[in-house]
Amino acid sequence: MSLLMISENVKLAREYALLGNYDSAMVYYQGVLDQMNKYLYSVKDTYLQQKWQQVWQEINVEAKHVKDIMKTLESFKLDSTPLKAAQHDLPASEGEVWSMPVPVERRPSPGPRKRQSSQYSDSKSHGNRPGTTVRVHRSSAQNLHNDRGKAVRCREKKEQNKGREEKNKSPAAVTEPETNKFDSTGYDKDLVEALERDIISQNPNVRWDDIADLVEAKKLLKEAVVLPMWMPEFFKGIRRPWKGVLMVGPPGTGKTLLAKAVATECKTTFFNVSSSTLTSKYRGESEKLVRLLFEMARFYSPATIFIDEIDSICSRRGTSEEHEASRRVKAELLVQMDGVGGASENDDPSKMVMVLAATNFPWDIDEALRRRLEKRIYIPLPSAKGREELLRISLRELELADDVDLASIAENMEGYSGADITNVCRDASLMAMRRRIEGLTPEEIRNLSKEEMHMPTTMEDFEMALKKVSKSVSAADIERYEKWIFEFGSC
């Protein structure tokens, strides 16, 4: 296969397309695309590959245009069904298609119309002879022809629509009911669209088993979100579901990961809200956004509103740094959260709306918000068992050497957060690659095979990674978190 052959085939395909021979043009276009695909495998230069891929896309667009023209020409072709269909050929079940008019039997009239009836009988008797003409009223014949044509066309159109509907009908469209759309009457369309973008429609794909340790936190979130939907009759009255849960802890301990697990496992509408979502430069619009958020959550209930870094939105009121606009937003948020408890208002736990919040600065949160977040749980640093489990989760896709002892590595990581442990694993997994490419030129690195790069991670790699990656949380920070949770915690 040569470039000259590809060039000649492209030239022939374009010439046939210009001459109107679209069938031959499509054959050449398809051959050119296949030849270019084979040629791309032999090209090693990245720049040339990009250029050839761009040319392939342009040729593919030309082929699609020719294909569209062929489809358009096919639609112009008349059906071979005769227009003058007999009356018994039409389906009797189609009520909207009028039946053809019944021929009226003409009887000879007395008196002066005798001559006309004789002419009619003569023409009727000689109708089968060649060269004789039959007198038929032009308007009635034309109407009969039009009625027959309309009936046939109506039947064909209905069959085409029915076939198209059956073709487009997928199993997902049959099984999944149509979701209700939020009525945005009274609100700006842009505000509604901005909040709808924060609804997580795609699965974050984080399971409870992907989170090491944190048994109490997972148990509480299941009790607050999952169990009320499984046992709605139980969670009523004083047993109503929790309206708010606050996750407190150092950075990197898995608070956001727990929220992703809630979005994956709990099958509720999940709103991922940040401070930028509820902030606007126009006066009064931020409060409208807060109110609209909770109204949409009630509409799509059961729902979970996750507010990460809630201290940036609802910090302590009455300070000198507070602005009037932020104070109004806090007031609206507090009012809406107090009215969020769907279970306490209509005794229907399946229509609940729960606020799930996370913060690294719980001492900066307003007292009224702290009261509304009824469950305040501490997300601590992982224990020795949790660190070992987290190592297994992070390294499950890697090939480890026989000398790797995860229990010993976990003991050396005391004081490390979950994010720190993940960074250690990532750095250790890159050590073998760094040793392999040391001293090589870019061309030699590009020519390395996959087998040479995928080497097992050794214990020495983890020891070197531990020397490079330090813990990010100090003992003084841990003491401050434990003091706050001892005073205000509600686990």
UniProtKB/Swiss-Prot annotation:
Its EC number is 5.6.1.1. It catalyses: n ATP + n H2O + a microtubule = n ADP + n phosphate + (n+1) alpha/beta tubulin heterodimers. Phosphorylation by DYRK2 triggers ubiquitination and subsequent degradation. Ubiquitinated by the BCR(KLHL42) E3 ubiquitin ligase complex, leading to its proteasomal degradation. Ubiquitinated by the EDVP E3 ligase complex and subsequently targeted for proteasomal degradation. Residues 1-185 are annotated as: Interaction with microtubules. Keywords: ATP-binding, Cell cycle, Cell division, Cytoplasm, Cytoskeleton, Isomerase, Microtubule, Mitosis, Nucleotide-binding, Phosphoprotein, Ubl conjugation. ATP binds at residues 249-256. Residues 87-185 are annotated as: Disordered. The modification Phosphoserine is found at residues 42, 109, 170. ATPase activity is stimulated by microtubules, which promote homooligomerization. ATP-dependent microtubule severing is stimulated by interaction with KATNB1. It is an enzyme of class 5 (isomerase). It holds the Pfam family AAA_lid_3. Residues 1-75 are annotated as: Interaction with dynein and NDEL1. The modification Phosphothreonine is found at residue 133. HAMAP family: Katanin_p60_A1. This is Katanin p60 ATPase-containing subunit A1. The lineage of its organism: Eukaryota, Metazoa, Chordata, Craniata, Vertebrata.
